UniProtKB/Swiss-Prot annotation:
Belongs to the tweety family. Residues 1-43, 108-212, 260-388 are extracellular. The record marks 163 as: Essential for the formation of the channel-pore. Glycans are attached at residues 128, 282, 353. One of its GO terms (biological process) is L-glutamate transmembrane transport. The keyword Glycoprotein applies. The keyword Repeat does not apply. GO terms for cellular component: chloride channel complex; plasma membrane; smooth endoplasmic reticulum membrane. Disulfide bonds join 273-383, 301-368. It comes from the Eukaryota. This is Protein tweety homolog 1-A. It comes from Xenopus laevis. GO terms for molecular function: intracellularly calcium-gated chloride channel activity; volume-sensitive chloride channel activity.
């Protein structure tokens, strides 16, 4: 389980994490998230292939039903045919209604997934802003200290060259300034790493845009098929129902395929979300070679993990305090004797004030709470909203696949019974919900009221 403060794996994550992981040899595989390992990839592909098995079963059922329909249709009497037409029509309507309900679920799931991924990208950009601010603040402060050492402190050494006690104080100040610069330079832990959170956020956002668009198109396609199927049944347009039957068959393949992809994604994501800290720490350390203590500090952010920057920050703070004392002593004792040194001492004092302001800002940025909050927000977006959205998309694909399986079985029987619209409809079943005669009587009855 995750030890991150503020994040806890959800119950559906724990349930999916317990799904058996089996490779192609039907051997149990460890359910720890390891997408780079072939056995784990086999386990996810095996789960995705379950949808392929369901597709094969649905195709067999469709074939058996259509064969029976073709062979047994001629043996039915007229009353049985009319009754069956009514049942088939209602079956098609029920399948379309279920599909429409699935489409609504799909739109919600797609939106939830998009919200979760957006939260991840937003957190990555915040993380990049914090890390960039640390690097810029450190580099600016180190550059400022170096410039003071090269200019003002060097000039002060020349001015106090004949006074040993003042020269010793200036050289001590110089060593402490150089020590502060060195300590701060070592704090910039993310500088020069190959992992850029902003680039990663752009890549994730790019992939998510196409994923979101693909699902929107699939949902709209399903909705259009449902509407045109109802139109064809209501108006008894044979060619339209035939076209919708063919299109429904291809969408049936897409539905089972998307279900397999969503099933593998949901299980893989649950494996990650059940214990994200270990995977994130190992991968980040492998790519960036950052000290594991630093990564553990920001990932855990609790009292049990010491601040890895504490010693450097404490040393720098003491050095800045000593520099303050020495500068005050020089202003009090040296300036009356060396008036030309006042300008350089004021410049060093201004540098010291700026450095202390940057130092306090740097301490706030280095605190684990900011980066840890971004990390937890990313986990919540991915493992709460993202996981919930994928599960709703999985339900949509399942309902869509079942609905189109029923439609492909039922629509051929419906279009075969359609009569030419110019013929007499007296022999039609009065209980048929799309009987044109019944609709005509209803319109006449309304006009007479």
């Amino acid at each position: 389980m995750s030890t991150s403060h503020g994040y806890r794996a959800s119950w559906w994550t724990n349930i999916l994490h317990q799904v058996p992981h089996t490779n192609f040899q039907f051997e149990v595989v460890d359910n720890q998230f390891a997408p780079q390992e072939w056995p784990y990839q086999q386990a996810l592909l095996f789960l995705a292939s379950i949808a392929g098995l369901c597709l094969a079963i649905s195709l067999i059922l469709i074939c058996v039903y259509l064969i029976r329909f073709c062979c047994c249709a001629s043996q039915e009497d007229d009353d049985s045919k009319n009754h069956r037409v009514c049942c088939v029509t209602w079956s098609c309507v029920a399948a379309v209604i279920i599909c429409c309900a699935g489409i609504g679920i799909g739109f919600y799931g797609n939106s939830e997934t998009n919200d979760g991924v957006y939260q991840v990208t937003y957190s990555l950009m915040n993380t990049n802003h914090t890390l960039t601010s640390i690097n810029l603040l450190v580099s600016d402060t180190v550059e400022l200290l170096s410039s003071v050492v090269k200019s003002d402190l060097t000039q002060l050494e020349e001015i106090f060259s004949k006074r040993t006690e003042f020269l010793v104080m200036i050289r001590n100040t110089r060593r402490q300034v150089e020590s502060v610069a060195q300590q701060l330079a070592e704090i910039s832990f993310w500088k020069g790493t190959e992992l850029n959170p902003n680039v990663l956020a752009e890549q994730v956002n790019f992939i998510e845009d196409y994923r979101w668009l693909a699902y929107i198109l699939l949902l709209l396609l399903d909705l259009i098929i449902c509407l045109f199927t109802l139109l064809g049944l209501a108006k008894r347009i044979k060619w339209l129902v035939i076209v919708m039957t063919v299109v429904s068959f291809f969408v049936l393949l897409l539905s089972w395929g998307s279900m397999g992809l969503e099933m593998a994604t949901a299980v893989g994501l649950s494996d990650f979300c059940s214990n994200p800290d270990g995977y994130v720490m190992n991968q980040t350390q492998m790519i960036t070679n950052i000290n594991p203590d630093i990564l553990q500090y920001y990932i855990s952010c609790n009292q049990d993990v010491a601040n890895p920057f504490r010693q450097r920050l404490t040393t720098s703070q003491r050095a800045l305090s000593n520099i303050h004392s020495q500068l005050h002593g020089l202003e009090r004792e040296a300036v009356p004797q060396f008036p030309t040194a006042e300008k350089n001492l004021l410049a060093v004092q201004g540098m010291l004030n700026t450095t202390e302001g940057n130092f306090h800002h740097l301490v706030a940025l280095l605190n684990c709470r900011g980066l840890h909050k971004d990390y937890v927000d990313a986990l919540k977006g991915l493992c709460y909203d993202g996981m919930e959205g994928i599960l709703f998309l999985l339900l949509f694909s399942f309902l869509s696949a079942l609905s189109f399986t029923a439609a492909v079985c039922s629509l051929p029987r419906a279009w075969k019974r359609f009569q030419n619209r110019d013929l007499d409809y007296d022999d039609m079943d009065e209980d048929d919900p799309f009987n044109p005669q019944e609709s005509k009587r209803f319109v006449q009855w309304q006009s007479s009221i």
